[in-house]
């Protein structure tokens, strides 16, 4: 009986690590200013750290207690802006590295596990279709943003560490794609933003000797950011993601993701072309799976 419960625990570990690999570039789909208007020819290099800690909601009928997960995540990102058909476009590449630990008490036995390695690389291509022309640095100084409409495609590339014979993995061993549409509206010092996207996944054909499929996951975000004269800004962030039912060798898991998160962001310049950003977010509602909080710190260097 204990062996069965251990298998169930390992399966839940796999699902949780699986979603850790899908959603974050630096955090879980809380990305304010993703469609911000900036000059073309801008290069941005960022290095960040994210700490995540939380508990796992399990079936009450299972003898599982104190199921917790903790991870330390580091990532580097590069962003390049350019003109495309006189519209502002950008490409972003992010590569995370993760240290994860988990533990649970099953039938009065302590079970622990850990993983270390690269997670899946993310590449984002976006273009602002309306309200954001491709301007050089001198032209940009006199431009005033009103309403921006943009689209993007995020691609998750299976570069993460993965073992086909283990339930706990950092990598996902499959590709994922998220087309997204976003709107950004300026109200004096306040920038209001809303994004909507859907994650689509290819199959993982090496999941413990089985084929693992996942239905699309919908993602909605909303952000409100207040800018000060020195380009320091603070923001309120929220996201809702739902769907994502999994199927292993044709057998469906009826549980789906239905999670709502809220958080805040603070960014301030520290020198010419340099800034630091801090973000905190927490689960406001979680129907199943991992209910966690995350704290991140990012250093950013911009140049032309």
Where are these regions (language model features)?
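Outer-membrane beta-barrel biogenesis signature
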Residues: 25-46, 131-145, 304
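Outer-membrane pore/translocation modules
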Residues: 99-213, 255
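Repeated loop/turn-to-beta-strand initiation elements of outer-membrane beta-barrel proteins
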Residues: 55-56, 86-89, 132-133, 189-192, ...
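Transmembrane beta-barrel strands of outer-membrane/channel proteins
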Residues: 45-51, 91-99, 149-157, 194-200, ...
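Outer membrane beta-barrel transmembrane domains
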Residues: 211-304
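Surface-exposed strand-loop-strand hairpins of Gram-negative outer-membrane beta-barrel proteins
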Residues: 52-73, 111, 164-168
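Residue-level signature of outer-membrane beta-barrel architecture
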Residues: 49, 80-82, 127-129, 155, ...
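Hydrophobic, lipid-facing positions within transmembrane beta-strands of outer-membrane proteins
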Residues: 43-45, 72-76, 119-123, 149, ...
């Amino acid at each position: 009986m204990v062996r069965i419960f251990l298998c169930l625990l390992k399966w839940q570990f796999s699902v949780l690590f699986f979603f850790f690999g899908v959603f974050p570039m630096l955090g879980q789909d809380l990305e304010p200013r993703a469609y911000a208007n900036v000059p073309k020819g801008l290069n941005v290099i960022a290095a960040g750290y994210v700490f995540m800690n939380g508990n796992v909601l399990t079936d009450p009928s299972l003898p599982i207690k104190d199921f917790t997960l903790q991870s330390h995540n580091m990532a580097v990102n590069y962003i390049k802006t350019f003109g495309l058909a006189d519209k502002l476009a950008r490409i972003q590449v992010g590569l995370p590295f993760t240290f994860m630990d988990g533990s649970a008490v099953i039938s009065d036995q302590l079970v622990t596990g850990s993983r270390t390695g690269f997670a899946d690389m993310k590449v984002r291509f976006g273009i602002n279709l309306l309200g954001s022309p491709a301007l050089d640095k001198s032209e940009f100084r006199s431009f005033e943003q009103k309403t921006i409409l943009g689209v993007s495609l995020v691609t998750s590339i299976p570069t993460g560490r993965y073992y086909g014979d283990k339930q706990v993995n950092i990598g996902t061993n499959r590709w994922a794609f998220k087309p997204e549409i976003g709107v950004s509206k300026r109200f004096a010092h306040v920038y209001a933003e809303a994004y909507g996207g859907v994650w689509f996944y290819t199959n993982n054909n090496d999941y413990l000797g089985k084929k693992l499929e996942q239905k699309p996951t919908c993602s909605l975000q909303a952000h409100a950011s207040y800018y000060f004269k020195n380009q320091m800004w603070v923001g309120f962030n929220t996201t809702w993601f739902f769907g994502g039912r999994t199927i292993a060798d044709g057998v469906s898991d009826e549980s789906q993701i239905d999670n709502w998160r809220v958080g805040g962001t603070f960014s301030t310049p520290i020198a010419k072309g340099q800034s630091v950003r801090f973000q905190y977010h927490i689960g406001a509602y979680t129907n199943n799976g991992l209910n966690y909080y995350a704290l991140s710190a990012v250093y950013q260097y911009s140049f032309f």
